[in-house]
A protein has these predicted regions:
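C-terminal catalytic/acceptor-binding lobe
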Residues: 147-148, 157-158, 162-222
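Conserved catalytic core of nucleotide-sugar-dependent glycosyltransferases
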Residues: 70-167
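A short acidic, amphipathic alpha-helical/loop segment
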Residues: 23-24, 46-47, 73-77
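Short, high-confidence coil segments that cap the C-terminus of an alpha-helix
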Residues: 56-57, 83-86, 186
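Active-site nucleotide-sugar/metal-binding loop of Leloir-type enzymes
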Residues: 45-59
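A short, glycine-/small-residue-rich helix N-cap motif at loop->alpha-helix starts
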Residues: 38-44, 171
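N-proximal low-complexity "stem/linker" segments adjacent to membrane-targeting elements
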Residues: 1-35
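Short beta-strand-to-loop acidic/aromatic patch adjacent to the donor-nucleotide binding site
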Residues: 57-68
Length: 222
């Protein structure tokens, strides 16, 4: 029987209940691992363990439940992931407020340690800057970045084996991942064709269900 050379596992971190996200993810036909209602500092190491014991999968795909994406977005990154150890899409930073003008991409490493920092300590690029870069080089949409906020990030198995998911005071896994990749000499890339919608609202705190609903790990083969 024919088996695809690239076999990603979409790892979904779901601390909320978001119908818009659930509708989007249902349209992507891929094996999924749901990490439901765990705090971040437990969710990521647990997901790493679950992925590593499933040796048939080639890539760990980070997907958070506040990111709206399409099957096209997923397929573009899947088509490129064998060429890069780490490749992601990108999105707006917030959806409302001052930071809605900014992207998830930074051309500098995040503050370290990140736990006591604020968004003002990051150096996120404006969306218009990223759009200009894309339009200036339409034939070269993939760029190297120090940090991109884990926007549907494809990590090769060898990267997941080498790099643990660390946290600082229970948060900031994405920031520390960027530092750990940098320190290990592993480059990460963003495909500018894959722009998604980040549902991060300035005026409303997230309706987290961590501690309110039972946590669970659910494997969902397609």
């Amino acid at each position: 029987m024919y088996q695809e050379r690239t076999r990603p596992l979409l790892v979904i971190f779901q601390p909320r209940y978001n119908e818009r996200f659930l509708d989007a993810v249902s349209k992507v036909k891929v094996d999924k691992l749901w990490i439901n209602y765990y705090p971040q500092h437990i969710a990521y190491p647990l997901a790493r363990i679950e992925f590593l014991k499933r040796e048939e999968y080639t890539h760990f795909v980070i997907m958070t439940d506040d990111l709206i994406f399409t099957n096209r977005d997923y397929q573009i990154l899947k088509g490129e992931c064998e060429k890069y150890d780490v490749i992601s899409g990108w999105a707006n930073n917030w959806i409302t407020g001052y930071w809605a003008e900014y992207s998830s991409i930074s051309f500098k490493l995040p503050p370290n340690p990140p736990g006591q920092s604020t968004i003002y300590d990051y150096d996120f690029a404006k969306i218009i800057t990223i759009q200009v870069m894309k339009e200036a080089n339409p034939d070269k949409p993939i760029i190297e970045v120090p940090h991109q906020g884990t926007m549907m990030t494809f990590l090769s198995r060898k990267v997941v084996e080498k790099i643990p998911f660390r946290h600082d005071c229970g948060c900031c896994v994405d920031a520390l991942l960027s530092h750990d990749l940098h320190n290990a000499g592993i480059k990460q890339y963003v495909d500018l064709r894959v722009r998604m919608l980040h549902l991060k609202y300035a005026e409303l705190p997230p309706d987290l269900l961590v501690g309110k609903k039972p946590s669970s790990v659910v494997f969902e083969p397609q």
